[in-house]
């Protein structure tokens, strides 16, 4: 009995037990009473009452007594009391070591520093808000941004998990049901093979591919990054793990038609969903960053050429993407900042631009398998042709704008997006019109027409999300066969709508026999303009340079970069670091308006010290008399060292339209049906291709011409009239097609909505300027121009079809702070206040009489510009979150003047709101 009691007491007094002790279970009531130290003799009558059958009162009393005894013993144990004869179990020592004498607590220094750092990070934004005098709305904005960031990262992780699940069990996922747009290419196209044997081969080779990639990162990329900048001297990859999921090939297509007999063309639909871990560190700045997952999807073309009669039967291997692939990256460490909404799309776009500079058509990776002599032609790719797209008009489009929650149907604000491979164009927006007339022309290079299509999509511009109005896809092989297509095409994926296009396939001629005729057709023989319809194509292969002089420091090697320009079109090569004998091996193309009057200007610059290392000017007329209109040699640089040369290969090709006679009942199959794609996916894809700006080497992408003047082709109106077009429509078409409007050509960012920030800040800035003006007056009489003046030159160029505005200078501006002002000029061509229509000068620091001398242009015709107003605002620039930003003055210039074609230069008075339009005086 004593042993049972001690065991029961010790179990209840076990130190460290946080839960309420359970009552020990006994076989009988006598054992239960003995365990608690009493029997029936100590409590007379208890045993008899407890054994009485059906006694509910006895049961309740027994339970109450037992609970009271347990509570009494527990209170005694907590107060240091114990029953006589029972030893109290010693308390075990606390984890973490013995207790400190005198009750002094031990504090870990790293933990304390971490806690202080977290507290500082939390309190610093609060202090900054108070110091900068910002409102509480910034806190709400930060919280919203944080929530958006977490949601974005969660969605990205969810997409990664779905993609991994699809790769692991593709058959089960397909059987459960997926959308048609998510299926691989071999499901949609019968000529695309699944080639599962290739995936099995890649899976077996994947561990060795990972070893090669790790060596590439550690032995090639890491030393290159360290040598690029002294601040990156401690850069290193701490972990390079590409992951266990191999690259997957969803379909393979081999071209057998319209292919040279000495080449093999394959299209691989690749998909990589990798749970990779790539971590990097810059020890000097305690900076850690990395990538934890990557997704990339796209169509990669592999060309085996030339086929030869000797082993290995293939001269070289060329690899490139037909268009920018889809990319998604999950960042870790410091690069988590790139997952912030707004920055995540920008970071992915920058990486895509870097990939495009090496792997997107016309850029390619060429792996020679034989001697350099046989593959020299591969490093100088010549386009198969040039596609001239006349984007004329549309009819019977859907009305997407509604009012009163859909009760009243309105019209649409249509615009078009045209894509040829990696080249994307966007038309201007026609407000509230279901039969818009654009009358715009684009020119695009076509390097690989098998497998490439002309894709056109129409959208209705809205402030929040643009609505889909229809699409069109045209096979470029059929356009090449027809040479000229001028007709109405029915829009796909919508119930109604037609689009009028004129497509011209221009052949590249290696002689100048047809040049005079081409110049006459495009009206380039009557002016010296540098833009307009193109008559020729300039192809330039930049090879290398030798014996370049040093920069400003004689002992250091320069970082050479080459800038090339023809007229107002300029392109730039990649930067080669720390060398005076750089090797570029890059290709560039320029559309030429009139080769008889235009020159190629080349300048080699030191990017580090921003100085010129030499320049060169090549008249294009020299190429007209050269053999095959091609020159390949080393050119002597001017204003450079005595032996400084640059090696280039330059070729000129005349753009010739070969017209073919067709019977009246001739049919073609140019329009093709696109695979079923969700509208949401389509819009996302287009945005991903149009977002971002080219990087430093982004000019290598095949350039496109701006929208330019049209042509007066005989019979164009009669051939292109739709069934329901009337005489008035034909008259309008003939009138509008004779003067095609100009607008930006190759675009990279689609920003249709107005600049909201400017609209919101305008009333506030005007009010602040009026208060500042009253403070300046303060009982004194101000002059005629209290806010100062601005000098502008305004004219309209009929040759370029553009409004040209030259901002010369400002004088007598007001001081925005004690140090003066940091003025710059912002312009809009009202009523267009979109961000893409904004023009800005550079900022002049700490001056009240800045000199800008900068020229800007707006693509608009003369009749239209005379109905518009030029909005010019002089503003003060400040740093990020600075209080010194504000308006210095405005002026509105009415352009309804007959002298606009001649132009004028004038000083304009600045006012606080610019509400008084000023015309030419």
From Swiss-Prot:
Ca(2+) 1 binds at residues 400-401, 460, 462, 467. The modification Phosphoserine is found at residues 691, 693, 736, 738-739, 743, 748, 755, 758, 761. The chain crosses the membrane at residues 104-124, 128-148. Residues 58-75 have a biased composition (Basic residues). Widely expressed with high level in cerebellum. The keyword Aminoacyl-tRNA synthetase does not apply. The modification Phosphothreonine is found at residue 705. GO terms for molecular function: cadherin binding; calcium ion binding; calcium-dependent phospholipid binding; identical protein binding; phosphatidylcholine binding; phosphatidylethanolamine binding; phosphatidylinositol binding. SUPFAM superfamilies: C2 domain (Calcium/lipid-binding domain, CaLB). One of its GO terms (biological process) is lipid transport. Residues 833-840 are annotated as: Required for phosphatidylinositol 4,5-bisphosphate-dependent location at the cell membrane. One of its GO terms (cellular component) is endoplasmic reticulum-plasma membrane contact site. Ca(2+) 2 binds at residues 401, 413, 460-462. It comes from the Eukaryota. Residues 191-370 form the SMP-LTD domain. Its main location: membrane. Anchored to the endoplasmic reticulum membrane by a transmembrane hairpin structure; both N-terminus and C-terminus are cytoplasmic. Homodimer. Interacts with ESYT1 and ESYT3. Interacts with FGFR1 that has been activated by FGF1 binding. Interacts with the AP-2 complex; identified in a complex with the AP-2 complex and FGFR1. Tethers the endoplasmic reticulum to the cell membrane and promotes the formation of appositions between the endoplasmic reticulum and the cell membrane. Binds glycerophospholipids in a barrel-like domain and may play a role in cellular lipid transport. Plays a role in FGF signaling via its role in the rapid internalization of FGFR1 that has been activated by FGF1 binding; this occurs most likely via the AP-2 complex. Promotes the localization of SACM1L at endoplasmic reticulum-plasma membrane contact sites (EPCS). Belongs to the extended synaptotagmin family. This is Extended synaptotagmin-2. The lineage of its organism: Eukaryota, Metazoa, Chordata, Craniata, Vertebrata. The gene is ESYT2.
């Amino acid at each position: 009995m004593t042993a049972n009691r001690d065991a029961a007491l010790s179990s209840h007094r076990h130190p460290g037990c946080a839960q309420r002790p359970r009552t020990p279970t006994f076989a009988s009531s006598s054992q239960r009473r003995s365990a608690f130290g009493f029997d029936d003799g100590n409590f007379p009558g208890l045993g008899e009452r407890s054994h009485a059958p059906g006694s509910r009162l006895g049961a309740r009393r027994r339970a109450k007594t037992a609970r009271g005894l347990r509570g009494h013993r527990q209170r005694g144990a907590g107060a240091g009391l114990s029953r006589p004869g029972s030893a109290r179990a010693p308390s075990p020592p606390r984890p973490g070591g013995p207790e400190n004498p005198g009750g002094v607590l031990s504090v870990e220094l790293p933990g304390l520093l971490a806690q202080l750092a977290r507290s500082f990070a939390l309190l610093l934004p609060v202090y900054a808000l108070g110091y900068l005098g910002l409102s509480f709305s910034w806190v709400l904005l930060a919280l919203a941004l944080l929530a958006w960031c977490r949601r974005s990262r969660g969605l990205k992780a969810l997409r990664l998990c779905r993609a991994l699940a699809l790769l692991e069990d593709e058959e089960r996922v397909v059987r459960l049901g997926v959308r048609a747009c998510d299926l691989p290419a071999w499901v949609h196209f019968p000529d695309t093979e699944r080639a599962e044997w290739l995936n099995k081969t890649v899976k077996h080779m994947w561990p060795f591919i990972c070893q090669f990639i790790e060596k590439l990162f550690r032995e090639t990329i890491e030393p290159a990054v360290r040598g690029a900048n002294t601040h990156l001297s401690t850069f290193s990859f701490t972990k390079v793990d590409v992951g266990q999921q191999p690259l997957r090939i969803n379909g393979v297509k081999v071209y057998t038609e319209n292919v040279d007999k000495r080449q093999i063309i394959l299209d691989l639909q690749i998909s990589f969903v990798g749970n990779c871990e790539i971590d990097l560190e810059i020890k000097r700045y305690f900076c850690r960053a990395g990538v934890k997952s990557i997704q990339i999807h796209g169509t990669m073309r592999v060309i085996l050429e030339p086929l030869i009669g000797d082993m290995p039967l293939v001269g070289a291997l060329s690899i490139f993407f037909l268009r920018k692939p889809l990319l998604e990256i999950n960042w870790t460490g410091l690069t988590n900042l790139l997952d912030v909404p707004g920055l995540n799309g920008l970071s992915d776009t920058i990486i895509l631009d870097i990939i495009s500079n090496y792997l997107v058509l016309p850029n390619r990776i060429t792996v020679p398998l034989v001697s350099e002599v046989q593959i020299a032609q591969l490093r100088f790719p010549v386009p198969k042709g040039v596609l001239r797209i006349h984007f004329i008009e549309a009819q019977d489009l859907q009305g997407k704008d509604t009012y009163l929650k859909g009760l009243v149907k309105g019209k649409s604000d249509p615009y078009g997006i045209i894509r040829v491979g990696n080249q994307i164009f966007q038309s201007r927006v026609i407000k509230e019109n279901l039969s818009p007339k654009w009358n715009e022309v684009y020119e695009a290079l076509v390097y690989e027409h098998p497998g490439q299509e002309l894709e056109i999509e129409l959208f209705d511009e809205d402030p929040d999300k643009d609505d889909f109005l229809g699409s069109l896809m045209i096979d470029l092989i059929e356009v090449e066969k027809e040479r000229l297509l001028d007709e109405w095409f029915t829009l796909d994926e919508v119930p109604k709508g037609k689009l009028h296009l004129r497509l011209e396939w221009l052949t590249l001629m290696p002689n100048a026999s047809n040049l005079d005729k081409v110049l006459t057709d495009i009206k380039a023989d009557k002016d010296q303009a540098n833009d307009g319809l193109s008559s020729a194509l300039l192809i330039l292969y930049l090879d290398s340079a030798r014996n370049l002089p040093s920069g400003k420091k004689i002992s250091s090697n320069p970082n050479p970069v080459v800038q090339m320009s023809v007229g107002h079109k300029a392109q730039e090569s990649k930067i080669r670091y720390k060398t005076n004998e750089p090797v570029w091996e890059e290709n560039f193309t320029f559309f030429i308006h009139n080769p008889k009057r235009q020159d190629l200007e080349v300048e080699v610059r030191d990017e580090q010290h921003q100085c010129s290392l030499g320049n060169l000017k090549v008249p294009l007329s020299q190429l007209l008399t050269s053999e095959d209109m091609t020159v390949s040699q080393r050119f002597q640089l001017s204003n450079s060292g005595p032996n400084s040369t640059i090696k280039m290969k330059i070729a000129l090709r005349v753009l010739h339209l070969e017209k073919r006679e067709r019977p009246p009942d001739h049919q073609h199959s140019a329009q093709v049906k696109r695979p079923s794609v969700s509208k949401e996916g389509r819009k996302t894809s287009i945005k991903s291709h149009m977002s971002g700006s080219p990087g430093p080497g982004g000019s290598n992408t095949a350039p496109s011409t701006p929208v330019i003047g049209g042509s007066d082709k005989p019979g164009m109106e009669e051939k292109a009239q739709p069934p329901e077009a009337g005489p008035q429509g034909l008259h309008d078409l003939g009138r509008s097609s004779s003067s095609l409007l100009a607008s930006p050509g190759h675009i990279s960012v689609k920003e249709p909505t107005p600049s909201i920030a400017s609209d919101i800040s305008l009333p506030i800035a005007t009010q602040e300027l009026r208060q500042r003006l009253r403070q300046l007056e303060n009982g004194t009489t101000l002059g005629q121009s209290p806010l100062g003046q601005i000098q502008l030159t305004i004219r309209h160029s009929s040759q370029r079809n553009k409004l040209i505005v030259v901002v010369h200078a400002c004088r007598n501006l007001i001081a925005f702070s004690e140090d003066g002002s940091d003025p710059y000029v912002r312009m809009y061509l009202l009523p267009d206040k979109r961000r893409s229509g904004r023009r800005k000068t550079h900022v002049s620091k700490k001056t009240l009489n800045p000199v800008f001398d900068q020229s800007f242009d707006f693509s608009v015709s003369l009749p239209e510009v005379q109905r518009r107003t030029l909005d010019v605002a002089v503003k003060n620039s400040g740093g990020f979150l600075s209080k010194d930003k504000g308006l210095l003055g405005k002026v509105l210039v009415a352009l309804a003047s007959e002298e606009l074609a001649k132009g004028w230069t004038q000083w304009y008075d600045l006012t606080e709101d610019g509400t008084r339009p000023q015309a030419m005086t």
